[in-house]
Amino acid sequence: MALLELRGISKRFGGLQALANVSLALDDGIIASLIGPNGAGKTTLFNTLTGLYRPDEGEIIFRERSLIGLKPENITAAGISRTFQNIRLFSYMTVLENVLVGMHARLQTSLPAILLRSKRFHAQEDQGRHRALELVELTGLRGREETWAGQLSYGEQRRLEIARALAAEPEILLLDEPTAGMNSQEAQSLMTLFKELIGSYVKAILLIEHNMRVVMGISHRVHVLDYGEKIAEGDPEEVRRDPRVIEAYLGQGTWVPDARD
C-alpha cells in the first residue's frame, strides 16, 4: 500500500480550474518529481496537500488516514513537511535558531514546564540543539550555525530550508523547486543529499523541479501536470519520451532533456 495517495483532487479559484481530478501515489523509499510547464498547478497541489488549501473534490490519504480538513501544523505533526518556492526563513535569526524553530511540531514539553524551565524542558532543549547541529552539518552548513539566515547565500538559504523541514522529523519531505537559482555543481550536491535522506531521515521525497537534469537524474517516478490535469506518469525515460509531455513543453519553447545531455 502506498505511503501517500491523492485521489481525484480538484481545486477551483473562481472560474479558474487549478487542479482537475489529479491522482498520484507515493511509495516508501521513493524520490518522485512533479513537473509541468509554468502555471500547471504544481504548487497548488503542494498547498492542497499540506492544508493551505482545501480541495473542492477528492481525498488525500496518508497512512490510511484522511488529511482533508487538517490544519497545516497538524499535517506537519502527522509526518509531512515542506519547503517553499519562495524562501521563508527568519532572516534575523541564526541558522541554528531557524532549525530549532522547525522542531516545534515535535515538542512534548508543556507550557508550564517551559515557563518554569523544568528539568524536562532543559533535557528536551539539549536534545533539540544536538539534533539541530546534526541537521546543520548534514545540509552542508557547518560553521554557519551562528550566522543570521539573511546573511547566507541563496544556495545556503535553500539548504537551511531543507534542514528546517527535516527538523520536524517527517516521513515525507515535499520540496518546491529546491535547486532554483543554483549552478550545476550546487544542484548536483543537493541531488546527492536527497539520495542520502531516503531511508535515513525520511521515507519518501516529492519534489517540484524545473531543472530537468535533476528530475531525470534522481527520480524513481515522475508525474506531469499541464493546465491542472495529470497528463503523464512513469519512470524518467518513459516520461521524457511521452508525446503529451513533449507537446506540453514545446508549447513553452522548452524541452525535456536526457539526464546525460
What are these regions (language model features)?
Residues M1-D261:
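Glycine-rich phosphate-binding loops of nucleotide-dependent enzymes
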